């Protein structure tokens, strides 16, 4: 069992029942999935950029990403319909818990000028989204193999349904929020 999941079951669940004043243990917010997305807009000119993004996401998550394609053509961006423009991975189960553990304990502290994550990145339905501007903060990414610095989006989806429940869950798991 992943370390963070064990912490969730033994420490976070009892604390969340008290903190959110829940009557049933099944009402406790829980993680559903984590989606890691990379938009490689420059891939329209150079296909090598998309290959790098796919390899980077595979190294970070340990799972093969799905290539995302343009839904419609936009001439101002020189974009054709069905052209590959990025990649994404949906993590569930043990891989999700292990990725979140590495994100909280290793990756986020390595971000330059880090002063805590914003509490405002919630969508009202219990999902927390954060953007990372440089992929080189991940220990799985080799700096020598990176030709261009790019970012990625991480969406943490919960079964909470409310921003308050999601924030409480992430704080109990050790997510470093701004004071």
Task: Specify the residue positions occupied by each region the protein language model found.
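Ribosome-associated RNA-binding proteins
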Residues: 1-179
